[in-house]
A protein has these predicted regions:
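Conserved "repeat-terminator" motif of extracellular CCP/Sushi domains
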Residues: 1, 68-94, 216-225
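Feature for mature exported/ectodomain regions
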Residues: 3-10, 90-188, 195, 225
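Extracellular modular ligand-binding repeats in secreted and cell-surface proteins
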Residues: 3-54, 78-81, 168-182, 218-219
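Surface-exposed loop/edge segments in extracytoplasmic proteins
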Residues: 15-17, 64-67, 162-165, 197-204
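Short structured motifs
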Residues: 29-32, 71-73, 159-164
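Surface-exposed interfaces of beta-sheet-rich extracellular modules
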Residues: 41-72, 183-197
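Short, solvent-exposed loop/turn segments in extracellular or other extracytoplasmic domains
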Residues: 68-73, 171, 206-211
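Generic recognition of long tandem-repeat/solenoid scaffolds
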Residues: 74-77, 149, 161-165, 210-217
Length: 225
């Protein structure tokens, strides 16, 4: 529940390229699986949590699982007995770290658009990027502050360590909310994004408490103008 357990390789060979008996030929899906494997074969499995969940443990008859370089991937050596394995997935929260002087708090919605599994870590930090070009994107701009928005996918290995991968480009956007520190009710605010040298003024709404809301599918440098 809340994830998938599947066998993907045996002795390095993809199971989709192998032939099995009708008795045991399902390497795994959402409903489970049943596969015939020889003793001493090296079995590669995936224990994939849904978004918002992490692998908190794995039940596999006492066999040791070895995390691999690829996310959510483990190996074990087949013992001389039947093995039953499953992932134990626990609901967990995304992580948000805000240290930027201009931003007092941050949040996001639709995180599954950025990470198909595990959780996200959003880091909001000050940037020393020049604001001149960003100011030129906004009519009647007076000042701007640069912040870096960094997004990482975090997937637990089940042993207290994680796979961590940066997320910079999304197919579908997430909704960002940044609360402006020392919000000036008399001023207007816009958000300009700089990604790979391209500047884009984003459609931004401003709430009464100074929270800027906008959608984005790229994570790099942002300017609060």
């Amino acid at each position: 529940e809340h994830g998938t357990a599947e066998i993907i390789k045996i002795n390095g060979q993809d199971v989709s390229q192998m032939t099995f008996s009708n008795f045991a030929n399902n390497p795994g899906d959402k409903s489970g699986g049943h596969l015939a494997v020889k003793r001493d074969d090296v079995v590669t499995i995936k224990l994939i949590p849904d978004y918002g969940y992490q692998l908190s443990g794995a039940s596999i008859n006492g066999v040791t699982l070895a995390p691999q370089a690829e996310v959510s991937t483990f190996t074990f050596t087949m013992p001389d007995t039947n093995v039953h394995f499953k992932g134990i997935f626990t609901q967990t929260s995304d992580e948000i770290n805000t240290s930027a002087t201009k931003v007092s708090s941050a949040s996001f919605e639709n995180g599954a658009n950025a990470a198909p599994s595990g959780n996200l870590r959003l880091t909001v930090a000050d940037s020393n990027e020049d604001t001149t070009n960003a100011l030129a994107q906004v009519e009647n701009a007076v000042s701007a502050e640069a912040v870096n928005l960094t997004l990482d996918q975090i997937v637990s290995k089940g042993d207290g360590t994680n796979w961590e991968n940066p997320v910079t480009q999304l197919d579908q956007p997430v909704k960002m909310k940044l609360q402006v520190a020392d919000y000036d009710t008399a001023a207007g605010y816009e958000v300009v994004r700089e990604h790979n040298g391209n500047l884009t003024k984003l459609t931004t709404s401003v709430s009464e408490d100074g929270t800027l809301t906008f959608e984005t599918n790229q994570f790099s440098t942002y300017f609060i103008v």
